[in-house]
Amino acid sequence: MFPDAQVPYLAYYGTLEPPTQVKPGEGVFLEYAPMAKYKNPNSDGYRTYVPMEQKYLKPLMEMFGKENAKVLEYWIDNSMYSNYTKPPKILNVDPEPVRKDIAYYKSLGIDEITTFACYLGQDYEDLYGIPDIHAYTQAF
């Protein structure tokens, strides 16, 4: 019915390990959403992204290939940083991990990289003013 349709394999929490029983069909591409890496900061509070992505992302890329691969990041997902409660916390973007992430994804051949941006609406502006995402944009 839709011969050119595409659908993502969403690699997220319980689906980070590549499937072992099936292979991706025609039109299935990888969408990597590495939320788990934000739940495991190291002793300095800096998230340990490289080991997790080497463990999961490389095998996923081997299975799905880089064609149409996408990353859905959480760099400015203030809902997560606010523990999914209101009022939102102030957003602090550290550009260095964003730069490292982008460089790593690009080294694997992934060009389409996006991020969630949540809890940055009117209630955030009423508390803190317009969200400062300058550090995030500078990483690109």
Label each PLM-derived region with a short phrase.
Residues M1-F140:
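Catalytic-core regions of glycoside hydrolase
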